[in-house]
């Protein structure tokens, strides 16, 4: 899976989970500051990403994922 494919899939999931227009979701979008996510939204988003990409995101790692780009980078590293 290429970085672009991961980015598109992450953006789609973020858009759906946070009920925002897909055009608003960019690589540098911060989940809380730019997209209006609260802490519960963030937990649900992490769970959705884990399911969609069949990976596990430990709590420590999840705390470091603040933007769409952070999520893409983490998934890329996990999927190798």
Swiss-Prot record:
Q: Which domain of life is it from?
A: Bacteria
Record InterPro entries? ACP, ACP-like_sf, PP-bd_ACP, Ppantetheine_attach_site
**Record's PANTHER family?**
ACYL CARRIER PROTEIN, CARRIER DOMAIN-CONTAINING PROTEIN
Q: What does this protein do?
A: Carrier of the growing fatty acid chain in fatty acid biosynthesis.
* Domain (Carrier): residue spans on this chain: 4-79
Protein name (database record): Acyl carrier protein
Briefly state the modifications made to the protein after translation. Answer: 4'-phosphopantetheine is transferred from CoA to a specific serine of apo-ACP by AcpS. This modification is essential for activity because fatty acids are bound in thioester linkage to the sulfhydryl of the prosthetic group.
Q: Which gene encodes it?
A: acpP
What protein family is recorded? Belongs to the acyl carrier protein (ACP) family.
Is Transcription regulation one of the keywords? no
- SUPFAM superfamilies per record: ACP-like
């Amino acid at each position: 899976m290429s970085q672009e494919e991961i980015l598109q899939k992450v953006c789609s999931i973020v858009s759906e989970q946070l009920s925002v227009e897909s055009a608003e979701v960019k690589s540098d979008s911060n989940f809380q500051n730019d997209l209006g996510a609260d802490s519960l939204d963030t937990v649900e988003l992490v769970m959705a990403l884990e399911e969609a990409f069949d990976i596990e995101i430990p709590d420590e790692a999840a705390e470091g994922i603040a933007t769409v780009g952070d999520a893409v980078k983490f998934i890329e590293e996990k999927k190798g």
